[in-house]
């Protein structure tokens, strides 16, 4: 298959990224599915993986990417076959530690927190495997729009709902409204009935 492969770490990431041949993922194990990628989205995490993440040892070459939309074309043994043919998006967090307190989100720097596209090969490829528990059916949504949903909205949701427990009428200050997480936060604030206030260097 074809994949966007990061050959090595370096300060100028694009010089070390190329479209290249890569082995297809193996047959999915129990509880997993293989996804044929329709669209994958860039995230700032891709730059961190390309430049190197302090304290995290990564092997290269590797495939980046944590956000994607695709069609399930294979499932593992004893896995619900009704997933086949469904268009899905991905929660890239394949391993999450228990929260210190019930209302706390899992820490993204805990030793057992793992992401496709960071700790494991990612989704900037024609195919990838993922646990079905990490996939969400998204019918009738433009794959290009759906692909960009995952990390940004999950980060914003964890911050607003899991951690801050935002309620209708709460004021929420969002700085740097042009970014992906900030835009996701704005949309979630509206959905939650909160009262967002945004800042930007751009005069609108």
Question: Which positions does each model-derived feature cover?
Answer:
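Short N-terminal binding/cap micro-motifs at the start of the first secondary-structure element
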Residues: 10-19, 44-46
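Glycine-rich beta-strand-centered segment in the early N-terminal region that forms part
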Residues: 23-41, 53-104, 108
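Glycine/charged-rich beta-loop-alpha catalytic/anionic-binding loops adjacent to active sites
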Residues: 134-144
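Residue-level marker of beta-strand positions
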Residues: 86-87, 127, 171, 191
């Amino acid at each position: 298959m074809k994949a966007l492969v990061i050959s090595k770490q370096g300060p100028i990431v694009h010089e070390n990224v190329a479209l290249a041949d890569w082995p297809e993922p193996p047959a999915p194990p129990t509880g997993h599915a293989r996804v044929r990628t329709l669209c994958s989205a860039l995230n700032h995490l891709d730059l961190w993986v390309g430049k190197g993440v302090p304290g995290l040892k990564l092997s290269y070459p590797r495939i980046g990417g944590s956000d994607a939309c695709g069609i399930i074309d294979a499932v593992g043994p004893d896995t619900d076959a009704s997933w086949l043919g469904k268009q899905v998006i991905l929660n890239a967090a394949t391993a999450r530690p228990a929260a210190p307190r019930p209302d706390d989100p899992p820490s993204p720097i805990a030793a057992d927190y793992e992401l496709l596209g960071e700790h494991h090969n990612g989704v900037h490829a024609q195919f990838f495997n993922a646990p079905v528990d990490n996939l969400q059916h998204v019918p009738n949504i433009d794959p290009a729009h759906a692909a960009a949903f995952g990390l940004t909205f999950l980060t914003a949701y964890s911050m607003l709902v899991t951690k801050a427990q935002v309620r209708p009428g709460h004021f929420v200050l969002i700085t740097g409204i042009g970014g992906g997480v900030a835009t996701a936060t704005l949309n979630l604030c509206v959905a939650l009935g909160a009262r967002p206030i945004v800042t930007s260097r751009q005069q609108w």
